Amino acid sequence: MQKTLALVAHDHKKPELIRWSLEHKAELEKHNLVATGTTGGLLQEALNLPVTRYKSGPLGGDQQIGALIAEGKLDALIFFWDPLNPAPHDPDVKALLRLCSVWNLPVACNTSTADMLITSPLFIEGLYERAVPEF
């Protein structure tokens, strides 16, 4: 079952996300991929797959991904954020992670959780249907 996945990474985490994406290219190519600007360009180049690119995170890209979550257009977020280097758009990062919690969206913030998400039989076989809160 094809899903829409957002892939986002802070500058110091971009190489890690690219390595992870290359390891999981066979699974990623089955899905619609969206990303913030710079990360999306790097992913397109490395994977040779189509990636819908939004603005760079500090220029509103995190908020654009957040809008997809609120509109029910995203199935999971893989967000390798950097907890050791503060970013000028940290409030946007917090808002994005908050939306994942509000809308019960699966989110992976490191390679361990991303591995578990992308290799889960529930995810791969489309057996998991997340409960979307009604407000």
Curated annotation (Swiss-Prot):
List residues of the MGS-like domain.
1-135
- Which UniProt keywords are listed? Lyase
The record lists substrate as bound by 10, 14, 36-39, 56-57, 89
Q: Which residues form a coiled coil?
A: none
Q: Which reaction does it catalyse?
A: dihydroxyacetone phosphate = methylglyoxal + phosphate
One biological process term from GO is: methylglyoxal biosynthetic process
Task: Identify the catalytic residues.
Answer: 62
Q: What is its EC number?
A: 4.2.3.3
Keyword Lyase assigned to the entry: answer is: yes
What's this chain's function?
Answer: Catalyzes the formation of methylglyoxal from dihydroxyacetone phosphate.
Name of the featured protein: Methylglyoxal synthase
Q: Which organism is it from?
A: Pseudoalteromonas atlantica (strain T6c / ATCC BAA-1087)
